[in-house]
Amino acid sequence: ISNKTPRQSIKNGFAMLTEERRATGIFPYASILFNTVISNLGSYKKGPLLSDKKMASDTDWSISSMHIKTPSQKTLIKNLSGGNQQKVILGRWLLTKPDVLLLDEPTRGIDVGAKYEIYELILQLAREGKAVMMVSSEMPELIGICDRILVMSNGHMAGILERGKDFGGIENEQETIMRLAAQYV
């Protein structure tokens, strides 16, 4: 896989939710509509212009399907809670119709209710056949969601655990995960 630009990555079916949503995920002084459609502008072309109707429709879909709490698509994203900001970003990426989602700390800094909704979305995407790769520093999150956990230690792959196969399953293997994580320290 050789994706040299974000545009090429999107074209090849990849989407990435970054760890630092405020620094690299959102345009804080732009609307929810802008933040929703920015990664998919090519699909809104109507001659030399953009289709306002399609952008509004896709933003409505994102607000509805992601359960984003907002009074309007015109609301500045900086005025939303962290969880709702994260859901706007996820909706943005889903509109690109990715096959592979890279989620870096997808629930960092968001409330419990939004975490649950994001967990449900991740599981739904996996059921639909999407590849979801998640980076998380929260072990219960990994154990609760992942079918497979790759453990890194000091830049080295220390091991892979699979639900129901290795060491009696990852559900009860926090100790094994911690041991692997410390392997190359």
Describe each model-derived feature in a short phrase.
Residues 1-185:
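Glycine-rich phosphate-binding loops of nucleotide-dependent enzymes
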